[in-house]
Design a protein with these regions (language model features):
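Acidic, low-complexity cytosolic segments
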Residues: 1-30, 39-145
């Protein structure tokens, strides 16, 4: 389970992890699932994904999402709904999943990409309230006194 500093940490992260595990179990080609903030912090992960790997996947997914958003802005193509990266042995899907959050899935290369995209959209709709990630606020220096 990935920890989140909010007061709802245990409940929220536990619910997210359960929903991500459900996705991995139902769609057999999905290897791993992670929920991340737009700045690349993992806030939930499927079972079987080590914390270090969840954090790495979240950072990579955040980078791809950021690049896609930049391309959309630069070329007047609008917002990004989903980013997909095809590798020799896997696909990486990244989709917006609520205010300030993304859902990332790593799948086998044999995955039905249409089915994966459909299931991602269902998951995002089903758990939108769990996927809200408030923007981080910079720490203020202590008051002089």
């Amino acid at each position: 389970m990935i920890q989140d500093p909010s007061p709802r940490t245990d409940r929220r992260s536990g619910e997210l992890d359960w929903l991500l595990d459900d996705m991995v179990l139902r769609v057999t080609e999905v290897r791993h699932a992670v929920v991340l903030s737009n700045d690349g912090l993992a806030v939930g992960a499927s079972t079987g994904l080590k914390r270090e790997d969840a954090e790495h996947l979240a950072a990579v997914a955040s980078g791809f999402n950021s690049l896609a958003k930049g391309a959309g802005r630069h070329f007047g193509a609008g917002g990004v709904r989903q980013t997909m990266v095809e590798m020799d042995d896997a696909f990486l899907f990244v989709a917006a999943a609520g205010d300030g959050s993304c859902l990332a899935l790593l799948t086998d290369v044999t995955a039905d990409i249409g089915l994966v995209a459909y299931e991602m959209a269902r998951l995002v709709k089903r758990v939108g309230e769990h996927l809200y990630t408030a923007p981080r606020v910079a720490a203020r220096p202590p008051a002089a006194g």
